[in-house]
Amino acid sequence: MGLDPGDWQLQQLRSVSGLTGLERLTSATRAGAPLGRTVSEGPSKLSCVALTIGIVGLPNVGKSTLFNALTRATVLAANYPFATIEPNVGVVPLPDARLDKLAELFHSARVVPATVSFVDIAGIVRGASEGEGLGNQFLANIREADAICMVTRAFEDPDVVHVDGKVEPSGDIETISTELVLADMQTLEKAIPRLEKEVRGKKTEPVVLETAQAALKVLEEGTLLSAGAQAAGIDAEVLKTFQLMTTKPFIYVFNMDDAGMSDEARQAELRELVAPAEAIFLDAQFEAELVELEPEEAAEMLHDNGQEESGLDKLARVGFDTLGLQTYLTAGEKESRAWTIRKGATAPQAAGVIHTDFERGFIKAEIVSYDDLVQYGSVAEARAHGRVRMEGKDYVMADGDVVEFRFNV
């Protein structure tokens, strides 16, 4: 990243791990390299935070319509169960007005936002844990997701059949939650006898068996582990090793009609139903129409509908936060870009998201906060006012840090 031409150097990384045309991911000046000289690196691996949110829901709740809107993709959204057979993956940009401001300051040719990946997973019905419907395929696909977005129907439409014959959000949520709980119970019930033998043979630590038994007890009470594990005192790190579906964070999307979108009492009721998880209310059909418009027209349509932001933008933001992610920024004439890191990441770990060499040979990071940069208008002015700082290997990145990494390999 070159925040000021002449201050921070630019470089181009080419053909890294099969990725071609990857332009100037960041500026990086090797220790000892003359000022004004760019440094080119040989092939090595890129590191990235690639997390996905699985979109699940009973058939005909508007799940594929939502996915179509999220990705502007063409996904079959027919009015019959199992219209979605294979999981469809979409990468959705995370709205970030800071990038537009950086592009203005540095005359960037383009902006590259952070992204959230969504996977549209085939519909689930009662008995999925026993293989009913597309149960086995559903369970295999959802295990690969890092968080679960459960789409629930909260609108009435006689032309769109409901798989259970009635619209009842609490019932839909219970159906899907029950299938996930049952599937996780099966996983643990198979694992516990094996773990008991391994503990007796001193091949496995007792805490692993104890964690499995405690988790099974929570599930037997009909509670998702994401909601009940902490209260039960279950070791979170050990629990992760079982790769259970109900340990994943949940987001609940209620697909509503015009009446529902203006019914605050109904929304409060549904929000309480899924608390402490996040609840998002949107009209999937409206969102699908919105994404087909030019930005100015879309903004006007949102305003006329009494909304400050689209449901999709909110879903992307909530999804990003639910995954425990944040961004730092780079900027220059070629591009202004947001990079995705986990909350709590150190400066070397953040550098590794751009290129593994940056982490391996990390020396320091030159950082200015976005707010300070905008206030002073340039890196040079921010530096003159003492707002640009050098940080070392132990620095924990803050959201909105604008960064230049220095490294030596």
Predicted regions and their residues:
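Short, positively charged and aromatic/hydrophobic N-terminal segments
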Residues: 11, 39, 45-46
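Ala/Thr-enriched low-complexity intrinsically disordered regions
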Residues: 5, 20, 26-33, 38
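Conserved G1/Walker A P-loop phosphate-binding module
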Residues: 44-132, 136-142, 148-152
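C-terminal-of-GTPase-core extension/linker across diverse P-loop GTPases
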Residues: 44-56, 61, 67, 194-398, ...
